[in-house]
Amino acid sequence: MTFRTLDVDSITEPVLTEQDIFPIRNETAEQVQAAVSQLIPQARSAIQTGNALQGLKTLLSYVPYGNDVQEVRTQYLNAFVDVLSNIRAADIPAFVKECSTEEIDNIVNFIYRGLANPQAYNSSVLLNWHEKVVEISGIGCIVRVLNSRPDL
């Protein structure tokens, strides 16, 4: 006796493509590399002049995504964590209050990427940022990042 009224084997399996996972980007990998190559020195010079918050704003103005730019994303993450490390804990709440929802989501996304590799990045800095961001913006940023596509 069978309880199936539908022949499951006759249905073809859905195929998940890279376009389903990553949103379509209007730029080539070389253009992404060029854009990030311009942003990173600007952010590092902002750190050297004592304005790390401006360096973070600079980095948040352009976020690389896509599977074909992994090396660029790693360079970006290194610069991002360097900037976060140079911002005083007392300045974090005021900065987060000025950020848009998208910028906060990007910050949390990169915090999680940094926490995924504790050998390379200072977890205490990242956890401090995570605490302050969630305290101010709520748990919605966590939910949005965990439910988003893995595009960063």
Swiss-Prot record:
<dbReference type="InterPro" id="IPR006789">
    <property type="entry name" value="ARPC5"/>
</dbReference>
<dbReference type="GO" id="GO:0005829">
    <property type="term" value="C:cytosol"/>
</dbReference>
<dbReference type="GO" id="GO:0051015">
    <property type="term" value="F:actin filament binding"/>
</dbReference>
<dbReference type="Pfam" id="PF04699">
    <property type="entry name" value="P16-Arc"/>
</dbReference>
<comment type="function">
    <text>Functions as a component of the Arp2/3 complex which is involved in regulation of actin polymerization and together with an activating nucleation-promoting factor (NPF) mediates the formation of branched actin networks.</text>
</comment>
<protein>
    <recommendedName>
        <fullName>Actin-related protein 2/3 complex subunit 5</fullName>
    </recommendedName>
</protein>
<keyword id="KW-0009">Actin-binding</keyword>
<comment type="subunit">
    <text>Component of the Arp2/3 complex composed of arp2, act2, arc1/p41-ARC, arc2/p34-ARC, arc3/p21-ARC, arc4/p20-ARC and arc5/p16-ARC.</text>
</comment>
<dbReference type="GO" id="GO:0005885">
    <property type="term" value="C:Arp2/3 protein complex"/>
</dbReference>
<dbReference type="GO" id="GO:0005634">
    <property type="term" value="C:nucleus"/>
</dbReference>
<dbReference type="GO" id="GO:0030479">
    <property type="term" value="C:actin cortical patch"/>
</dbReference>
<dbReference type="GO" id="GO:0090135">
    <property type="term" value="P:actin filament branching"/>
</dbReference>
<dbReference type="GO" id="GO:0006897">
    <property type="term" value="P:endocytosis"/>
</dbReference>
<dbReference type="GO" id="GO:0030833">
    <property type="term" value="P:regulation of actin filament polymerization"/>
</dbReference>
<dbReference type="GO" id="GO:0043332">
    <property type="term" value="C:mating projection tip"/>
</dbReference>
<dbReference type="GO" id="GO:0005737">
    <property type="term" value="C:cytoplasm"/>
</dbReference>
<dbReference type="GO" id="GO:0034314">
    <property type="term" value="P:Arp2/3 complex-mediated actin nucleation"/>
</dbReference>
<keyword id="KW-0963">Cytoplasm</keyword>
<dbReference type="InterPro" id="IPR036743">
    <property type="entry name" value="ARPC5_sf"/>
</dbReference>
<comment type="similarity">
    <text>Belongs to the ARPC5 family.</text>
</comment>
<dbReference type="GO" id="GO:0000147">
    <property type="term" value="P:actin cortical patch assembly"/>
</dbReference>
<keyword id="KW-0206">Cytoskeleton</keyword>
